[in-house]
Amino acid sequence: MSDLNDVQENAKLNSETRNTGKAEPPHGTTEYVAEAEISKNGVGSPKKSPKKGKVGKGDNNKVETELVHTALLEKDNPFMEEGPTGFTKSALLEIPGMRSHNLKNPNEDYEDDSEGLLPLNQESNAETCRTSLSGSINSMNGETSASEEPSVSNRKKSARIHILEAKRVSEGQGRAYIAYVIQFENSTVQRRYSDFESLRSILIRLFPMTLIPPIPEKQSIKNYGKSITGSSSKYLLPSEGSGSVDLSLSVIHASVNNSDEKLIRHRIRMLTEFLNKLLTNEEITKTSIITDFLDPNNHNWHEFVNSSSTFSSLPKSILQCNPLDPTNTTRIHAMLPIPGSSSQLLLNKESNDKKMDKERSKSFTNIEQDYKQYENLLDNGIYKYNRRTTKTYHDLKSDYNEIGEVFAQFAHEQAQVGELAEQLSYLSNAFSGSSISLEKLVGRLYYNINEPLNESVHMATSARELIKYRKLKYLQNEMIKKSLNSKRAQLEKLEAQNNEYKDVDKIIDNEMSKSHTINLERPNNNTGSGGKSYGGKLFNGFNKLASMVKDSVKYQETDPHTASINLKKEIEQLSESLEVTENDLEVISKVIKNDQLPKFSKEREVDLSEILKHYSRYMRNYARQNLEIWKEVKRHQDFA
């Protein structure tokens, strides 16, 4: 009955659209160009041209690089309408270029689509996302060049990897693991979780300045059951996917409980996204590591890694490798110190006292704080409360199902009263129908909303790891500076002592040159006390014995000349290390701030926008279906 009402309502809406002749403007390039002109030219009237704006050569120099802001503001709400020009709720909302942006309710795009799927590769999604959130973390570079736009919209179109199945494989002696069958083009390969973990570890060492997508955290079924809400709950797998992942295509060939199933599907989703994002990274795809990982001929991935001279020669720490080419690490890179926790605290204090690298350090400190706040808002805010909401809907679904059964039993007992039994039957059917609708909603919220939000949290963590790498490189540079200054001070002190010794030697030589004879006779003791003379000799004997013991315990100090030579060698090595780390730090800071973080911001904007569109559509469809169910009950009650 509800399906028939949906069809009638859709037909009514279509007829109204034809009568009025007014159609909603599609998400085209015209709207995007208008917004682009505003963002480039500042406050002013947009140029309403249907053609894409071209970015001039000098435009990039005119736009100053802004800091990254990760605050989730009211403008992120797709239902928020443009407020009056004079409102100032908070300082965070006062972002240049936001007043000229007209937000649109995404429900209006799918007003006549109650059960159809939200297009996964809708081009208008990317176009809409580019013009939204212009003041959040995606505004690092001030504007988006035309050459960068297709890479964002084509990111999900180029996804070609699917995990077809997950099966339990026995290792013998009662041990087993879950193997994932990966389909890439026309071939399939089987990999386990530790293989993905090894691949990501290698990628981090091969591309230390690149944002490597996350993989699901390594944890047991027991720990994962504690980390998710309602671990014993079973969620209906939706027929449509989210992003480039369609979990309905993946089959679990194993006898698993609800917690195991959710963990496996959680891993399937994140591992699929991990591989698909790697395929869209031009820098990584220039190498053969991804094709090697997906090659069925490399049956055992760990054996392949151990047999590769390239992988085995990589430095264990990314702080001791050449960031531009880790496979060509120099001797100086291999000797660089690795900052520890104590050195970080000490150097942070000294850097604050001396105010070293004020602008660059302050810039990245603010960026790190913004990303940390953004990650916290996602994890402990949106993701947390969406999990709680999903659990509440799941419990409500069970309550609706139970109360529907109660009304059905009551109607059976009141069968002799025809009118009352009929009303009770209608109520029973209404609650049962609402329970079914809630079950569909809960499954979509869990798999298509909560799981993508969890992935966004992990992506924010990976971005902060990239910022942390730059911070550790900065601390490494400060350690070398501190050590170099200390060695130079020691050398100056040693040279000053040598000069003093030379002056003393000159004085002695001058005194000896005046007299050719040296008086070796012992001076007369006029004290007249023989006991004191004997005691003095005994005391001198003890002093000699003590000095012999002291020399046997302590190492003999090197002569000043040798110490001076060693210090000069150390200073030369530290100077070379300082030059290398300063060049590395400059390159790392430039790549992370101007390339990796803006790219992450654009992708994050597209992902969050798609999540919000899915969320609003799911809630709207459930509300519409539930309303029709209770309208039907009311019609029967009115006729009774």
Curated annotation (Swiss-Prot):
Transmembrane segments: none
Modified-residue entries (Phosphoserine), positions: S361, S363
Renumbered residue ranges of the record's region Disordered: 1-63, 126-156
Chief location bin: membrane
Topology of the protein relative to the lipid bilayer: Peripheral membrane protein
Keyword Ion transport recorded: no
Example of a GO biological process term: autophagy of mitochondrion
Subcellular compartments: Endosome membrane; Preautophagosomal structure membrane
Domain PX: residue ranges: 140-301
Keyword Signal: no
Positions bearing N-acetylserine: S2
UniProt-listed SMART domains: PX (SM00312)
Polar residues bias spans: 1-18, 126-153
Gene3D superfamilies assigned to the protein according to its UniProt record, in alphabetical order: Arfaptin homology (AH) domain/BAR domain, Phox-like domain
GO MF terms held by the record: phosphatidylinositol-3-phosphate binding
Pfam families, sorted: PX
The record's note on its domains: The PX domain binds phosphatidylinositol 3-phosphate which is necessary for peripheral membrane localization of ATG20 to the perivacuolar punctate structures.
Complexes and interactors: Forms a complex with SNX4 and ATG17.
Record-stated family: Belongs to the sorting nexin family.
Stated role: Required for cytoplasm to vacuole transport (Cvt), pexophagy and mitophagy. Also involved in endoplasmic reticulum-specific autophagic process and is essential for the survival of cells subjected to severe ER stress. Functions in protein retrieval from the endocytic pathway. Required for proper sorting of the v-SNARE protein SNC1.
Name of the protein: Autophagy-related protein 20
Source lineage: Eukaryota, Fungi, Dikarya, Ascomycota, Saccharomycotina
